Regions:
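Enzymes that bind and transform nitrogen-containing heteroaromatic metabolites
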Residues: 12, 19-214
Length: 214
């Protein structure tokens, strides 16, 4: 079968176009628990991330609900590859292999880890990315599931700065933390426009919002 092939350029990433449709590119989807002032550090536990003297770990706990849990599980139980920074990978590698019954999809998913120093796998299957921005531009062109980024603040910043994020799935909590690692620190990026795809408002004020890159 003869195909008419050409290339189109978007966000410095080439996507293959064929005469009968566009080959689907893998998406990078950032999923974050975020406070009103943009903090994403240590949402789940007191000692999850105490770097830089952060003492407010576990700040999402008071807002837990069955409805929120159900929405989070829709992402946890989908088809994905994990894309993580080194610290998040090390934390999750110590925890999730021992709780495979809770999140079996994470056990079989390929874990892509942005790190120039970590070379020993803690959680198979794992692929280390020593030049993550360059490598991800190529990986997005390959067949496979979308990439899910949880936590991994430094990696998330780099992905936004390089306009590689295709979707955001933000869980916004009605709390101001005042300090800690933020999703968008110091305005160190160019403007990027997203379209609101869906949002869910919980009775306790938590908002789950889904955005897609225009």
């Amino acid at each position: 079968m003869q195909m008419d092939l050409r290339f189109c350029l978007k966000s410095e990433v080439f996507c293959l176009v064929v005469s009968k449709g566009v080959v689907k590119m893998r998406k990078i989807i950032v999923l974050e628990h975020v406070s009103l002032d943009g903090v994403i550090q240590s949402p789940g536990g007191q000692d999850e991330d105490v770097s830089e003297g952060f003492t407010y770990g576990g700040w999402t706990g008071p807002f837990a609900s069955d409805e929120l849990g159900r929405l989070i599980r829709t992402q946890m139980h989908s088809d994905f590859a994990l894309l993580l920074g080194r610290k998040t990978y090390e934390q999750w590698g110590d925890y999730w292999p021992h709780h495979a019954d809770v999140w079996p999809e994470a056990q079989i998913a390929t874990k892509y880890v942005a790190s120039q120093t970590l070379h020993e796998s803690l959680w198979e299957p794992t692929v280390f990315l020593t030049d993550p921005i360059k490598q991800l531009k190529l990986l997005k062109l390959e067949a496979g599931p979308d990439f899910h980024v949880w936590g991994s603040s430094g990696l998330a910043h780099a992905l936004f700065q390089n306009d590689l994020v295709d979707e955001c799935w933000l869980i916004i909590y009605p709390i101001i933390i005042g300090s800690g690692k933020r999703l968008f620190p110091n305005g160190e990026m160019n403007p990027i426009t997203f379209t609101s795809m869906a949002h869910h408002l919980m009775p306790n004020g938590v908002i789950v919002s889904h955005y897609q890159r225009k």
